[in-house]
Each structure stands twice: as C-alpha cells, then as structure tokens.
Amino acid sequence: NGFSMLTFLQFLAEKYLEEKLIMYNQGKRYGQIVFLAGGAGSGKGFAIRNFMEKEKFKVRDVDAWKTAFMKLADTTDKYPEIKGLSLKNPRDVMKIHKFVKDKGIKEKSLDLLLRDVNVKNAPNVIFDITMKDANDIGDVLPKLLEAGYDPKNIHLTWVLTNYAIAIKNNQTRTRTVADDIMLLSHEGAATSMY
C-alpha cells in the first residue's frame, strides 16, 4: 500500500517543531495586558517577535531601556556613571540594572503610558518580566485596573526553557547575566508560577 508505520523510536527521531501563534482574546487590538514571565535567557524576546503578534502591542522591556540609556551615555555627556559599560560584562549589567531601577524608569514610563488611557481603546501591553518575584505583577496590577483594564483581559504566559539551554543562550546573547542571577531568575519564575 506504500504506507509504512514508523516504529516508536523512528517517530521519536523525527523532530517536529510545532509553532503556534498566540492570539490573546482572539487577537484583539485593544485592552489586552500580557505578563510574559521567564528566567534570563529563556527566549521571551524570541517569543514576542515570532509568536505573539508584536505589532499589536506596546512592549515594556527593561533591557531596551538599558540599551537606550547606555547609548545616550556613550554618545552624549549625560549619565557619565554608565558611560562605557558593556552588556557582555555581568558586573556592568548589574550596574546598569541598578541605574535604571534607581531612576524609577519602570514606574515613570508606566504612569506616562496609562495617563491618558481611554478604556475603549487602551493599548495592548506586554510586560517582559522574569517574575522572579510576584511583585513583578503585583506592583503594576492596581495601576492597570485603575486605568480601566478588565481583569479578564489580563494574561500570564510563562516562557519555560530548559535551564541548560538558557545558560547557553545567556552566553551568546547581547546581554550576559551573572550565573547567580541566572539561577535566581529561573528559580524565582518557577516558584512564582507554581
């Protein structure tokens, strides 16, 4: 009949990658909040770019702010305390992380984003977070609800990656996180998700 049945081992040897487009609330253009959780190097950025209709969302990514501030520091006289830092150096990554945190960028930019939100066309927002602690969500949720976002349109997605793969990803990406921070971010995400 020309059709042959694969043995179980042959079946396992065939490596199928099934990719799915994630459409929150059937792909609505407004009013969706996504908390995208996952440890450092887990592939959250890859998931956003390839599986999540990025064009429909404002993406809040602390790493993008770090890069922007470093570029400003390196090309202007602003922020001399971070001038010349490298995202490939884990110590520098910690310094720039502290710099952004101390400036209150996350809070200020969220306040600006939500300041003039119209409930009918509130922007879709992805929060790219490690979720190493539940405060990653708990700190912003009241502001989102106050702005008029409907709780049924607030989603939590966990990008779960084998830790060994995340370590390899960390070594080859543009921003390298210290080993202890890597472990804490993955343990914290797992604890928060469970």
Where are these regions (language model features)?
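Short acidic, low-complexity intrinsically disordered linear motifs used
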Residues: 2-15
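Pre-Walker A adenine-sensing motif
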Residues: 16-27
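Short hydrophobic/aromatic beta-strand immediately N-terminal to the Walker A/P-loop
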Residues: 34-35
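The Walker A (P-loop) glycine that initiates the GxxxxGKT/S ATP-binding motif of P-loop NTPases
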Residues: 38
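Conserved glycine(s) of the Walker
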Residues: 41-43
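Conserved substrate/cofactor phosphate-moiety recognition/catalytic segment
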Residues: 48-123, 135
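Conserved phosphate-donor/acceptor-positioning beta-strand/loop module used by diverse small-molecule
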Residues: 132, 149-168
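Conserved GTP-binding G-domain of TRAFAC-class P-loop NTPases and closely related GTPase folds
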Residues: 162-194
